[in-house]
């Protein structure tokens, strides 16, 4: 079944996830959707020092938004902050150094953040794909700790902050790779199965889709969404998937093309006309399962994921 899912996904990707797929989809975009200015609104972008995150932060800054960059690497983050200020002319760019794979650090960060700042939009962009099983200092598998638990803790902690503001939104940068994975709650940290970093990443992205749907039902005052940016030429892809990067080459999307739907979901009034909790691709809701792929999960399986995350979030608070 995994072989079928992977083949179907790759064929779909060649049609839709490439640069040519973006160019085709963009013919249906409403050009004025992103002709907005957002002074007075505050945006948090995790992983904002490179790739899609930096492209997103740059465009928000150019439109007058206050941007909070949440990054792990201080030196690279300082460089990104300086570049964004220089190119946008916007001084309201703040830098926060946080390792999202360490939930205690995330809880502490939010506790301090909410004492000084407001927030309208959270963009969960940061992620990692570690190809050999690696544990954090808390003993958690690093991909899961960053991509799933980190997103869960940060979003959960910030929901009360977001609910106080006008037009609050949460956008999570997922991946079309999640289409090859059924939600797995029996071994979420890959302790009992052969480790494949690409499949672990895809599983994390499936978990993000489930979380988005759950949050949307639980918190109707906030517009939640997740999205697939397409196959994008980013530093992360070059580092973690060198073979894939070499194979696709010039067919990969630019960082700006990858960031387009993130920006649309974060900025456009039209985005909140769509139901909360959806998965988006190129500014449109997209299916979360491939035909005949048997990747649907039961409510009990989804509840088990929440229970696992809640227990870990409490343990490391």
Swiss-Prot record:
Transmembrane domains' residue ranges: none
Gene Ontology MF term list: oxidoreductase activity
EC number: 1.1.-.-
Keyword NADP applies: yes
Top-level taxon in the UniProt lineage: Eukaryota
Alphabetic keyword roster: NAD, NADP, Oxidoreductase
Residues the entry annotates as binding substrate: 175
Active site annotation, chain numbering: 201
Binding site for NAD(+): 50, 52, 201, 205, 234
Family the UniProt entry places it in: Belongs to the short-chain dehydrogenases/reductases (SDR) family.
PANTHER family: DEHYDROGENASE/REDUCTASE SDR FAMILY MEMBER 12, DEHYDROGENASE_REDUCTASE SDR FAMILY MEMBER 12
General function of this protein: Putative oxidoreductase.
Name this protein carries in UniProt: Dehydrogenase/reductase SDR family member 12
């Amino acid at each position: 079944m995994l072989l079928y899912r992977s083949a179907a996904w790759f064929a779909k990707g060649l049609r839709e996830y490439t640069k040519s797929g973006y160019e085709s989809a963009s013919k249906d975009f409403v050009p004025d959707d992103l002709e907005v200015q957002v002074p007075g609104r505050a945006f948090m972008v995790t992983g904002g020092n490179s790739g899609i995150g930096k492209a997103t932060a740059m465009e928000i800054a150019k439109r007058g938004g206050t941007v909070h960059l949440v990054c792990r690497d201080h030196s690279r983050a300082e460089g990104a902050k300086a570049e964004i200020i220089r190119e946008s002319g916007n001084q309201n760019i703040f830098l926060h150094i946080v390792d999202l794979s360490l939930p205690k650090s995330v809880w502490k960060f939010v506790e301090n953040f909410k004492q000084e700042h407001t927030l309208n939009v959270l963009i969960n962009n940061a992620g990692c794909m570690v190809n050999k099983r690696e544990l954090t200092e808390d003993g958690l598998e690093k991909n899961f700790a960053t991509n799933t638990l980190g997103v869960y803790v940060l979003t959960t902690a910030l929901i009360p902050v977001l609910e106080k503001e006008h037009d609050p939104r949460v956008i999570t940068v997922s991946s079309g790779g999640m289409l090859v994975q059924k939600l797995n709650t029996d071994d979420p940290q890959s302790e009992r199965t052969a480790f494949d970093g690409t499949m672990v990443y895809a599983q994390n992205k499936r978990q993000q889709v489930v979380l988005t749907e759950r949050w949307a039902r639980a918190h109707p005052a906030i517009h939640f969404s997740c999205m697939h940016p397409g196959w994008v030429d980013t530093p992360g892809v070059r580092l973690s998937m060198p073979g894939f990067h070499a194979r696709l080459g010039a067919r990969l999307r630019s960082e700006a093309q990858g960031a387009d739907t993130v920006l649309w979901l974060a900025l456009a009034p039209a985005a909140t006309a769509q139901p909360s909790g959806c998965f988006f691709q190129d500014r449109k809701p997209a299916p979360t399962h491939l035909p005949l792929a048997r990747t649907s999960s039961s409510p009990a399986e989804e509840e088990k994921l929440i229970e696992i995350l809640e227990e870990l979030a409490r343990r490391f608070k």
